[in-house]
């Protein structure tokens, strides 16, 4: 529906459209505007130009998924393109997204890609503890061990108890 109406990911084909839409939205907001986009529609050839259009239009930060719209979730995140975008943006933070499943991959996006931050997507569904592991690493330099099954069960049980307290139901 969205693409058929020439919106959403379709704008990845037109940096001027990206600028225009973001500029209009930003002009009526009293809060920071952040944008997430993919590296492109079918190829990443406009990734830097699209990112610079968003920056020029006034976004406060830009997140980019390292795959094109055509790729969806196949293949691997294009780290070279993410690096080019990170280098091109000079006024706003750049947030790398895609294929970040471990502390080491988060570290790579910061150090090698040059991202200011990372965004975790699908990996969090299978490992919601990843956020804590990444935060702990960047605060201390220490990589925490993976949680044991027993630890995960304790956390799940505590979460269940809190839900029951909130909803007033019994186990």
What are these regions (language model features)?
Residues 1-18, 67-79, 140-145:
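Glycine-rich tight-turn/loop motif centered on a GG-T
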Residues 3, 63-65, 88:
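A generic short-segment signal for beta-strand/edge and adjacent turn/coil regions
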Residues 35-39, 66, 96-98, 122:
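A cross-domain feature marking catalytic cores of carbohydrate-active enzymes
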Residues 1-33, 38-46, 55:
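Active-site beta->alpha loop and helix N-cap motifs at the rims of alpha/beta catalytic domains
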Residues 20-23, 28-30, 44-61, 73, ...:
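Alpha/beta catalytic cores of nucleotide-metabolism and tRNA/nucleoside-modifying enzymes
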Residues 10, 14-15, 64, 127, ...:
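Short, solvent-exposed helix-helix connector turns and helix-capping sites enriched
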């Amino acid at each position: 529906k969205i693409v058929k109406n020439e919106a959403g990911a379709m704008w990845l084909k037109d940096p001027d459209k990206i600028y225009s839409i973001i500029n209009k939205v930003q002009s009526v907001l009293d809060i920071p505007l952040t944008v997430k986009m993919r590296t492109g529609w079918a190829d990443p050839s406009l990734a830097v130009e699209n990112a610079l259009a968003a920056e020029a239009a006034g976004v406060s930060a830009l997140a980019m998924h390292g795959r094109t719209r055509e790729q969806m979730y196949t293949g691997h995140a294009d780290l070279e393109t993410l690096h080019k975008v990170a280098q091109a943006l000079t006024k706003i933070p750049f947030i790398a997204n895609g294929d970040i499943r471990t502390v080491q991959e988060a570290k790579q996006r910061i150090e090698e890609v040059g991202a200011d931050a990372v965004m975790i997507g699908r990996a969090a569904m299978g490992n919601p503890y990843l956020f804590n592991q990444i935060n702990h690493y960047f605060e201390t330099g220490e990589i925490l061990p993976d949680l044991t099954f027993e630890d995960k069960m304790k956390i799940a049980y505590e979460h269940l108890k809190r839900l029951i307290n909130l909803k007033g139901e019994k186990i």
